[in-house]
């Protein structure tokens, strides 16, 4: 799929999710000044994985997936069905850490967190795709005679 087509479906998924304007039934954690300072320090150290393993993020992530019926919203916009495995920050965490736990952007009312499948998340983050290299030749030859 061409990148432009994918971006169009992604924008459609955000519009649809925003129009539904659902909210989870349970109260969710908010980003306090202390949490924001901790997150900012983790991002500066390149350790965002610590944040993504936190209980606050886990609760918000599961609530978003329930809101989206555990479906990838981008695939749904394309007329396909894929289970959502990831919750994506529309405005990336590094750019807007204050929105880390916000389902909707408070400035615009647009969905900030959406459920996506692994493949769509990789399309959204092409810079993070791992480049797999073939295994290097062994240093010494082993022979099984």
What are these regions (language model features)?
Residues 1-59, 76-81, 132-145:
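A boundary/linker detector
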Residues 19, 87, 119, 123, ...:
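Intrinsically disordered, low-complexity peptide-like regions
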Residues 30, 51-52, 64-67, 93-95:
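A short linear-motif detector with a strong N-terminal bias
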Residues 56-91, 117-119:
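Short cysteine-rich loop/turn motifs with clustered Cys
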Residues 79-80, 110-137:
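Short Cys/His-centered divalent metal-binding micro-motifs
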Residues 93-113:
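Short linker/helix segments within small regulatory modules
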